[in-house]
């Protein structure tokens, strides 16, 4: 990848206590001791659902509509987001979908770590964003013990933005909060959490534990959150 596109920067999965969710999480039951480590590298991300996943400096996002990406607020608010381009489904061997400048950001007005990022349609290479990505569909819902996958860019610059997918199980859902045991590392913030049909349940926003995150947490997409996202998809 062009060094001007993805520069080495902060790729930390946000520390749990630094988030507004921390006060809610402390009261939630946690049933797992260590995350599953079922992880595989996605070397060719040109097919669904992988071609809907994008890399930011320090995080991940998922495409949900025309020029529209969902990620975390703490990724969208990064000082680097307007300086560095968004890379569409970059992988180590497959053909990437281009590198795009950020147009604007719409933060969710509530405490949830959720934001919309709009990109310019034409990449620096002359590619069309919407012809080189897929749009991930929303799931109707999810429940405890459902199997999930998390796709993203753990350790971003350290791995030269290789894409990885991990699998696990939902352990708890309460309102817009969910806990699961799919393995995650710094750089997975904003990663889509998908069901077995590759439908979007929510996005990862934090983890606890050291190198092997013992618990991982996501923003669960309730009807209200899905409405916010759908209302901010470019027409």
Curated annotation (Swiss-Prot):
Lyase as UniProt keyword: no
EC annotation from Swiss-Prot or TrEMBL: 3.4.21.-
GO molecular function, one term: serine-type endopeptidase activity
InterPro entries: Peptidase_S1_PA, Peptidase_S1_PA_chymotrypsin, Peptidase_S1B, Peptidase_S1B_tx, Trypsin_dom, V8_his_AS
Factors inducing expression: Positively regulated by agr (accessory gene regulator).
Residues annotated as signal peptide: 1-35
Gene3D superfamilies assigned: Trypsin-like serine proteases
Keyword Signal: yes
Top-level division of the source organism's lineage: Bacteria
Principal subcellular localisation of the protein: secreted
Localization (cell): Secreted
Pfam families assigned: Trypsin (PF00089)
BP GO annotations: proteolysis
Keywords: Hydrolase, Protease, Secreted, Serine protease, Signal
GO cellular component term, pick one: extracellular region
Active-site residues, as the UniProt record annotates them: 74, 113, 189
Family that this chain belongs to: Belongs to the peptidase S1B family.
Protein name: Serine protease SplA
Source species: Staphylococcus aureus (strain NCTC 8325 / PS 47)
